[in-house]
Amino acid sequence: MFGTVFRILDEKNRIVMPPAFRNELEGDFYISANLEKILEIRSQTEFDLLAQKIGKANSLDPKLRDFARYFFGNTVKVSADKQGRFLIPKNLLDLATISKNLYLIGVNNKIEIWPEQRYEQFYAKFSDSEMTADLEKELLKSGVEL
C-alpha cells in the first residue's frame, strides 16, 4: 500500500477508508498501536503473520512478554460500513494523541495513522538537504538506489 490521505474524524470517531486502501484490505482489518505510538492498520492476513511471529518469540524473555501485552492489548478488529467508514476506539486515539485531524499513510503492507501535527513535523524533515543526503547514503548501503 502507498500514498498519503488527510482525514477528519467525525463526531463518532469514524473516518472513511480511501477506496484504494479498502480494496487492499479485503474485509475486516486490525488497528494496533506501535512502539512509536503511531496507529497501524493491517489486513487479516498481515495481522495473522505478525501475530504468529510474536507468538514464536521467546516467552521467557520479560521484555518480549511485555511487548506482546502492549501490542495485543492495544489492538482491535474493525469492520468498515457500506460507506467505508470505520471507528477508531478512543483509547487508541488517546494513545496516538489524535484529536480530530489525521493522516493515513500507506507503508508497504500496512497503513499508518498519524496525528496531523506530528505527521507534518515528520514530513518537514525531508526538506533538510543534509538529512536527505545522509538518508540516500544509508539507502545505497542497503542496496536501494532511488
Swiss-Prot record:
Subcellular location as annotated = Cytoplasm, Nucleoid
Kindly give the InterPro entries that the UniProt entry links to this protein: MraZ (IPR003444), MraZ_C (IPR035644), MraZ_dom (IPR020603), MraZ_N (IPR035642), MraZ_sf (IPR038619), SpoVT-AbrB_dom (IPR007159), SpoVT-AbrB_sf (IPR037914)
Q: Note one Pfam family from the annotation.
A: MraZ
Region forming the signal peptide: none
Instruction: Provide this UniProt record's keywords sorted from A to Z.
Output: Cytoplasm, DNA-binding, Repeat, Transcription, Transcription regulation
Q: Describe the location of the SpoVT-AbrB domain by residue ranges.
A: 4-46, 75-118
GO biological-process terms attached to the record: negative regulation of DNA-templated transcription initiation
Q: Per the record's keyword annotation, is Transcription regulation included, yes or no?
A: yes
What's a single GO MF annotation on this record? DNA-binding transcription factor activity
Q: Which PANTHER family match?
A: TRANSCRIPTIONAL REGULATOR MRAZ
Q: Which family does the record claim for this protein?
A: Belongs to the MraZ family.
Self-association state and partner proteins as the record states: Forms oligomers.
Q: What is this protein called in UniProt?
A: Transcriptional regulator MraZ
Q: Which organism is it from?
A: Mesomycoplasma hyopneumoniae (strain 7448) (Mycoplasma hyopneumoniae)
